[in-house]
Design a protein with these regions (language model features):
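Short, charged/polar micro-motifs that form catalytic or ligand-binding hotspots
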Residues: 42-49, 108-117, 154-162, 182
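Auxiliary, metal-adjacent structural segments of Zn-dependent hydrolase domains
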Residues: 26-103, 107-112, 132-139
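Short N-terminal edge-element motif at the start of the domain
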Residues: 103-110, 117-124, 128, 144-146
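Active-site recognition of the HExxH zinc-binding catalytic motif
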Residues: 116-133, 165, 169, 173
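Pan-zinc metallopeptidase signature
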Residues: 11-12, 25, 183-228
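Residue-level detector of alpha-helical secondary structure
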Residues: 8-11, 15, 19-27, 39, ...
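Non-Sec secretion/translocation targeting segments of pathogen effectors
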Residues: 1-7, 168
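Post-HExxH zinc-binding segment in Zn-dependent metallohydrolases
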Residues: 139-199
Length: 228
């Protein structure tokens, strides 16, 4: 069966026909990414960002192929780049919403950071996903599985969130590095190496080394150094 959204399965005490309708609804949501809430907040993607979306699609599809899964392309329309002043989450820089079938990303200052963040969110997008009709009297349609994350059947608890994030980030670090040889990132990689060499003794506020072998991007900003 052709994959029409990230949702692979519907769990719950409803008929098969109702489950099929939910899957179709998610497919329609995947195809329709017009959200009123994003009006005036989402900006147009740059040519470089569109090319990076294509590169990350190819790379994450190769990951799916390792596990015997078919390709699943995420169109640029499902990636929403939100302007800095409109971004609602102070700590987070991106998130995937399986119910809305889209990724929201705070606009990035570099191609390398955009690529790494998108790679992480696309792994979430392309991981196993299931939704459920909860077991409560006032049942509702919510997530059941996204990757390793599991919601209880009553919808009140979520397990393995930190594990899912850790595994996703480890896969991102390991496989996104394969894209760094692309010309889109060459200038930034050279800059990062220069900054790391210049500030090789730099530490964080908690006295840990600022840079390590997994540093993707670094930029000197006046008296501060920014890294990802």
């Amino acid at each position: 069966m052709e994959k029409i959204s990230s949702v692979d399965r519907v769990v719950g005490n409803i008929s098969e026909a109702e489950k099929e309708q939910i899957l179709r609804d998610k497919g329609e949501r995947f195809d329709d990414q017009n959200f009123e809430d994003l009006s005036g907040k989402e900006r147009e993607k740059t040519a470089s960002e569109l090319e990076i979306i294509s590169l990350v699609n190819i790379a994450t599809n190769e990951l799916r192929q390792r596990y015997g899964l078919d390709d699943f392309d995420i169109p640029p329309e499902n990636i929403h780049v939100i302007s800095e002043e409109s971004w609602p989450r102070e700590k987070s820089t991106a998130f995937f919403n399986s119910m809305l079938q889209g990724v929201a990303m705070r606009e990035k200052m570099s191609n390398t950071s955009f690529m790494k963040t998108l790679f992480h969110e696309m792994i979430h997008f392309k991981s196993y996903s299931a939704v459920q009709i909860t077991t409560e009297d006032d049942s509702e349609l919510i997530e059941y599985r996204v990757g390793l994350t599991v919601h209880t059947r009553d919808g009140k608890k979520i397990y393995f969130v930190n594990l899912n994030e850790a595994v996703t980030e480890e896969m991102t670090i390991r496989f996104a590095k394969n894209l760094l040889n692309h010309q889109l990132f060459s200038d930034e990689i050279a800059q990062t190496r220069s900054v790391m060499a210049r500030y090789q003794g730099a530490v964080t506020d908690s006295e840990k080394p600022l840079f390590d072998e997994d540093t993707f991007y670094a930029e000197a900003m006046s008296k501060k150094t920014w890294r990802e």
